[in-house]
């Protein structure tokens, strides 16, 4: 990714914040296995289109999603990070060669060093 910016941050629990920063760095590096390693067999990812359960289904989501975020061709800005114990909330936006995300948001529940639950929603415009 070309650009990563962070404009606001509140941290109450360093462990949860660390896990999410690892997750975002792995995503930005297009390291699929590292992204998936943040989840457990009980993890759930809810998006505006579907619900994914466990690492296998979650990996399937990221395989398709990460295709639109090539390294060195993506501008990703982290607008807000709020960490409150197990709860992590982020707001972001991104521009890629095939996708404009004017508003993206994720909410994470982190337990025992892993992402237990996650929601994702975004205002996305596919290009080409």
Predicted regions and their residues:
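Short beta-edge strand/loop motif at the mouth of beta-sheet-based domains
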Residues: 51-60
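Conserved short acidic donor-positioning loop in nucleotide-sugar-dependent glycosyltransferases
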Residues: 30, 49-50
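Short, well-ordered alpha-helical segments enriched in acidic and aromatic residues
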Residues: 29-42
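Short active-site-proximal "capping" loops at secondary-structure junctions
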Residues: 44, 50-51
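Solvent-exposed, amphipathic alpha-helical segments
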Residues: 15-26
